Amino acid sequence: MEPEAPDSRKRPLETPPEVVCTKRSNTGEEGEYFLKVLIPSYAAGSIIGKGGQTIVQLQKETGATIKLSKSKDFYPGTTERVCLVQGTAEALNAVHSFIAEKVREIPQAMTKPEVVNILQPQTTMNPDRAKQAKLIVPNSTAGLIIGKGGATVKAVMEQSGAWVQLSQKPEGINLQERVVTVSGEPEQVHKAVSAIVQKVQEDPQSSSCLNISYANVAGPVANSNPTGSPYASPADVLPAAAAASAAAASGLLGPAGLAGVGAFPAALPAFSGTDLLAISTALNTLASYGYNTNSLGLGLNSAAASGVLAAVAAGANPAAAAAANLLASYAGEAGAGPAGGAAPPPPPPPGALGSFALAAAANGYLGAGAGGGAGGGGGPLVAAAAAAGAAGGFLTAEKLAAESAKELVEIAVPENLVGAILGKGGKTLVEYQELTGARIQISKKGEFLPGTRNRRVTITGSPAATQAAQYLISQRVTYEQGVRASNPQKVG
């Protein structure tokens, strides 16, 4: 097949070429390179412009050629279109800066979750997406971005101030590409993306995957999210049968087939201060993993709430499971009321809850308002923080400053339970560090605390971060001990 002639009109190509990943030179004509970018569907229209005028003008100004996947041809597991940019390094950076500007203009309506089953991922946009850039790079380029022992990506983050994460590398199956997520303020993201473009220039195989459609790709492709499964798929949820069973057991399947949790936010007035912040943090965590928190207010009783949250926790990754378990404990507490009744699972110490919320605030888990926060608004934790601040001045500037001091905490974890904290390939440990902002280190295998079979777990960070990490680890250990007690055959 003859190669397609260049389009002299510089108009975007929306008819995807054949899906193919092959070894080829990293440049096009006259030192041009390729950069593949994910674009949220809400931003595509403003990038293309009426009748394609905006993108045509962008191509004229930068000298780049820009191709987009068709309007409903999304990257697997997302509602984002694939954009392939061809041009000089300067052109790639200029086009991406324009795209990033449009991505930051997230419509207010996109941040409002739809009322759907909490056990299903929501289709609305996470406000944090406005502060992210998502690039798709071949494995070879990903290796250069990471560098030996992670040295290169660490340097990029230190020099740019952005947070750079790559989708998980699977064991066994070798994915052709990986997704790079860059998070931060506009200038930070720009610096990090420029550094990534430099690695694209250095990689002879950086143009090996130039497809913009994944509709006919055979085999798995990389997950657009930096944590969780390496493979692109719908958000991790319970299988349909298990979800239906859990919902039916909790009396949640009404005429509309909706599953909701009435304890939140209906029960929020019963809590205040650190408890309120902890609840809102947990809600925000579930939302960040694709669970619909809007359906948490459908007026169902707390017993039903606990049932659904337990079902969510059973099928979620550790960070989301910890959030769901925390909400379940509060749902039980709200249901018990002053009259008592069944004793709810004991909530964690107030100090840990407050620290968990503070750590979330310090590490960007507050959520963002429309327009990257410039227009006010914010996620549920923002409102909770304001309410708590009004009630008792919980999040004062002085207290936040005090929380910035570094602290070292050591805890003991039984040898046979260390695997539960590490997770497969260390994923659970990575998630806990990302969620809290603390650094967590586990002593080497065979290195025990004197006179015990316990490994030493060292947590370093601000007091908020260390307490939050300690809480997550203790919750995980307690949960794993309970599972093994009820199922003695379970190991590791």
Curated annotation (Swiss-Prot):
Keywords from the UniProt entry: Autism spectrum disorder, Intellectual disability, Isopeptide bond, mRNA processing, mRNA splicing, Neurogenesis, Nucleus, Repeat, RNA-binding, Ubl conjugation
Q: Where is this motif: Bipartite nuclear localization signal?
A: 10-26
Cross-link position per record: Glycyl lysine isopeptide (Lys-Gly) (interchain with G-Cter in SUMO2): 112
Q: Answer whether the UniProt record assigns the keyword Nucleus to this protein.
A: yes
User: How would you summarize where this protein is expressed among tissues?
Assistant: Brain. Expression restricted to astrocytes.
Limits of the KH domain: 32-99, 130-196, 406-473
Offer an example of a GO molecular function term for this protein. sequence-specific mRNA binding
InterPro entries in the cross-refs:
KH-I_NOVA_rpt1, KH-I_NOVA_rpt2, KH-I_NOVA_rpt3, KH_dom, KH_dom_type_1, KH_dom_type_1_sf
GO BP of this protein: central nervous system neuron development; mRNA splicing, via spliceosome; negative regulation of cold-induced thermogenesis; neuron differentiation; regulation of alternative mRNA splicing, via spliceosome; regulation of axon guidance; regulation of RNA metabolic process
Question: Mind telling me which GO cellular component terms the entry cites?
Answer: cytoplasm; nucleus
Transferase as a keyword of this entry, yes or no, is no
Report the subcellular localization.
Nucleus
**Function of the molecule:** Functions to regulate alternative splicing in neurons by binding pre-mRNA in a sequence-specific manner to activate exon inclusion or exclusion. It binds specifically to the sequences 5'-YCAY-3' and regulates splicing in only a subset of regulated exons. Binding to an exonic 5'-YCAY-3' cluster changes the protein complexes assembled on pre-mRNA, blocking U1 snRNP binding and exon inclusion, whereas binding to an intronic 5'-YCAY-3' cluster enhances spliceosome assembly and exon inclusion. With NOVA1, they perform unique biological functions in different brain areas and cell types.
The record describes its quaternary structure and partners as: Interacts with PTBP2; the interaction is direct.
Q: Which disease is it linked to?
A: Neurodevelopmental disorder with or without autistic features and/or structural brain abnormalities: An early-onset neurodevelopmental disorder characterized by intellectual disability, motor and speech delay, autistic features, hypotonia, feeding difficulties, spasticity or ataxic gait, and structural brain abnormalities including cerebral atrophy, cerebellar atrophy, and/or thin corpus callosum.
> What is said about the domains?
The third KH domain (KH3) recognizes specifically 5'-YCAY-3'.
Protein known as = RNA-binding protein Nova-2
What is the organism field in this record? Answer: Homo sapiens
Encoding gene (name): NOVA2
